[in-house]
């Protein structure tokens, strides 16, 4: 393992792997069962290493094309959506069946861009991912092709996977495609194209080198992967573009081997993200916690539970940034709250298992999840 790959890959704890239509299907549109089985084996093995795994899978439309007996990718939006509606069920059933052979539970998450742009829905999506990962579930993500017009007309799962990587604070995003990585020109048309093993910054030259190559069944070319790289690396995730024809691509990446093109995540992303939560957004209210909760938050990286809350100050809604004060009214943290001020006032000091009895419902055990919390003294 060389020093650069060791630095950026050796300690990854959470990865997002995106596979495209060209990797999952044959040119006929039918599913490539051999590649799917190999993919599942590697993802399962990665989880066995202790790495949390999220799969962003294209292929719903491609699978639907095969099932419906279509000769080529549909051109109209209703035809594409019909193929996606049929294909999504086929794809998930296939994944569930093969993952079960390795004893791995899976959960389907269908997202739209709106889910990741609306504050409350963004928070809900984030909490769903964290809950699944904590229970050892492998989330399988796709954009909801059956209903989202914009995705089918303009979008791609490369961008979606980068947004998911940012959403869950992934250490590494892996885009699996049908070429070895990034070249200085399109290798499909230029036999003298030179391979680029590492990209430390996405410059105009890198964008120009991406070109626009894409397959007949998919929507994402290299240009969309570079755009995904901008999103991922700016939020701190490193990214690798790799050829899915290599049967051990994921194992090789995690072992630090020279495979694919590595895009280096920006090292100051954590600080930047924490500064956003700590300083860029003014808290709309405060939560005062007891000494036990303060210790759990500051020293043990725990979530804030209602039992440790003494009182609240101000009026705020679910999904807003609030200030957390200790019993001496000293500010110790900022966080994104799962409950509004009225709800917290009702459940403060109570065990989480009593939330439903008090409110009539329980959306979360935590008032603020540890992943949505920044300890100010750590900045």
Curated annotation (Swiss-Prot):
Pfam families: AA_kinase, PUA. Disulfide bonds: none annotated. It catalyses: L-glutamate + ATP = L-glutamyl 5-phosphate + ADP. It is an enzyme of class 2 (transferase). InterPro entries: AceGlu_kinase-like_sf (IPR036393), Asp/Glu/Uridylate_kinase (IPR001048), G5K_ProB (IPR041739), Glu/AcGlu_kinase (IPR001057), Glu_5kinase (IPR011529), Glu_5kinase/COase_Synthase (IPR005715), Glutamate_5-kinase_CS (IPR019797), PUA (IPR002478). Its main location: cytoplasm. SMART domains: PUA. Pathway: Amino-acid biosynthesis; L-proline biosynthesis; L-glutamate 5-semialdehyde from L-glutamate: step 1/2. Residues 284-362 form the PUA domain. ATP binds at residues 18, 177-178, 219-225. SUPFAM superfamilies: Carbamate kinase-like, PUA domain-like. Substrate binds at residues 58, 145, 157. Its EC number is 2.7.2.11. It comes from the Bacteria. It is found in: Cytoplasm. GO terms for cellular component: cytosol. One of its GO terms (molecular function) is glutamate 5-kinase activity. PANTHER family: GLUTAMATE 5-KINASE, ISOPENTENYL PHOSPHATE KINASE. Belongs to the glutamate 5-kinase family. Catalyzes the transfer of a phosphate group to glutamate to form L-glutamate 5-phosphate. This is Glutamate 5-kinase. It comes from Clostridium novyi (strain NT). The gene is proB.
């Amino acid at each position: 393992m060389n020093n650069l790959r060791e630095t950026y890959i050796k300690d990854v704890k959470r990865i997002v792997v995106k596979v495209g239509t060209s990797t999952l299907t044959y040119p006929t549109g039918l599913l490539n069962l051999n590649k799917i089985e190999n993919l599942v084996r590697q993802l399962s093995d990665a989880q066995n290493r202790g790495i949390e795994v999220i799969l962003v899978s294209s292929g719903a439309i491609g699978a639907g094309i095969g099932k419906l007996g279509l000769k080529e990718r549909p051109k109209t939006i209703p035809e594409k959506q019909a193929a996606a509606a049929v294909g999504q069920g086929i794809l998930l059933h296939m994944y569930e069946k093969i993952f079960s052979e390795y004893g791995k539970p899976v959960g389907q998450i269908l997202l739209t861009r709106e889910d990741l742009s609306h504050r409350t829905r963004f928070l809900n999506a984030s909490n769903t991912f964290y809950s699944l990962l904590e229970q050892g579930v492998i989330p399988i993500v796709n954009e909801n092709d059956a209903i989202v017009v914009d995705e089918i007309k303009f979008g791609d799962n490369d961008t979606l996977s980068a947004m998911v990587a940012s959403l869950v604070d992934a250490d590494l995003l892996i885009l699996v495609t049908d070429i070895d990585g990034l070249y200085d020109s399109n290798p499909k048309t230029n036999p003298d194209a030179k391979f680029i093993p590492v990209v430390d910054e996405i410059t105009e030259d890198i964008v120009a080198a991406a070109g626009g190559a894409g397959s007949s069944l998919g929507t994402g070319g290299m240009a969309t992967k570079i755009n995904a790289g901008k999103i991922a690396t700016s939020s701190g995730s490193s990214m690798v573009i790799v050829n899915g024809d290599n049967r051990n691509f994921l194992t090789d990446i995690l072992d630090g081997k020279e495979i694919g093109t590595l895009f280096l995540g920006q090292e100051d992303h954590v600080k930047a993200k924490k500064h956003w939560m700590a300083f860029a957004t003014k808290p709309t209210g405060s939560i005062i916690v007891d000494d036990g909760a303060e210790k759990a938050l500051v020293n043990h990286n725990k979530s804030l539970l209602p039992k440790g809350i003494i009182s609240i100050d101000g009026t705020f809604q679910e999904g807003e940034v609030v200030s957390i004060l200790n019993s001496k009214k000293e500010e110790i943290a900022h966080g994104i709250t799962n409950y509004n001020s009225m709800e917290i006032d009702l459940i403060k000091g109570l065990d989480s298992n009593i939330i439903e009895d008090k409110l009539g419902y329980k959306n979360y055990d935590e008032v603020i999840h540890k992943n949505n919390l920044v300890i100010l003294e750590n900045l």
